[in-house]
């Protein structure tokens, strides 16, 4: 065995959804934009993504982020989100977690007011987080996400075993195909995870056949990666319960941050909620919740959009210094799906 590389990471979870924060060891090109940094990672460090997200260090539902230096004084840090298969434009549960981890671990200076503001550069755009802290405790994160909008409504498709359904295509930092399950027998619960994953991948392929995906102002954003199933909540006070299926069939354990943003845009477009109306979202596990609110409207090019905020909390799980032997194909990472 020959140790070739050592990388330091922080592990967190946000209402059960994991995050591996990779904060050292990558020599990003000086002055590069966040898109240039992602291209640099894809070309030179994709092996690191695979090694940390996949087995034996990770698992099929692992999620992570490269915490990068800012590209300009307009930002405090950059975020490039990853999983075992690919890259994501944004992640809300991850933003909640990485912001809290930065404050808790001294990676950003604490504001004496007890509310520290962090400006993140993502490949979806600017995301501004506020982290509340008191003494040595970090309490919660609220972030204003990129603007959200509904791109298409009532996309008809067939879901095997559950009949004809309709989906809305919504942008909330990632593109989501949002599907109402209330008229079906499929329930959102951990014990139904395999079926939810399987149906989510089928639904995504069906929706992809019906729509062309293109962000109004960001030419590089043109893919549907997430499917969201939702139905009535099981926690009192929540507007809905949902699960987000993405990548190779991963299930988001949390209520979802970009997902909550997309869901608020979805419900606002259908007249269920209004601007400045707080909502609470419930995730797969039926335990944790996020708080959301649409604080205004804006435009993306000529398209009307809304401004979502999401609030949640994350827990610190631990740290690790990983040694990686790239000559060992098992050590380099593998997936069992």
Swiss-Prot record:
The active site is at residue 91. Substrate binds at residues 92-93, 252, 257-258. Its EC number is 5.1.1.8. It catalyses: trans-4-hydroxy-L-proline = cis-4-hydroxy-D-proline. Keywords: Isomerase. The keyword DNA damage does not apply. One of its GO terms (molecular function) is 4-hydroxyproline epimerase activity. It comes from the Bacteria. It is an enzyme of class 5 (isomerase). Belongs to the proline racemase family. PANTHER family: BIFUNCTIONAL TRANS-3-HYDROXY-L-PROLINE DEHYDRATASE_2-EPIMERASE, TRANS-3-HYDROXY-L-PROLINE DEHYDRATASE. Catalyzes the epimerization of trans-4-hydroxy-L-proline (t4LHyp) to cis-4-hydroxy-D-proline (c4DHyp). Is likely involved in a degradation pathway that converts t4LHyp to alpha-ketoglutarate. Displays no proline racemase activity. This is 4-hydroxyproline 2-epimerase. It comes from Cereibacter sphaeroides (strain ATCC 17029 / ATH 2.4.9) (Rhodobacter sphaeroides).
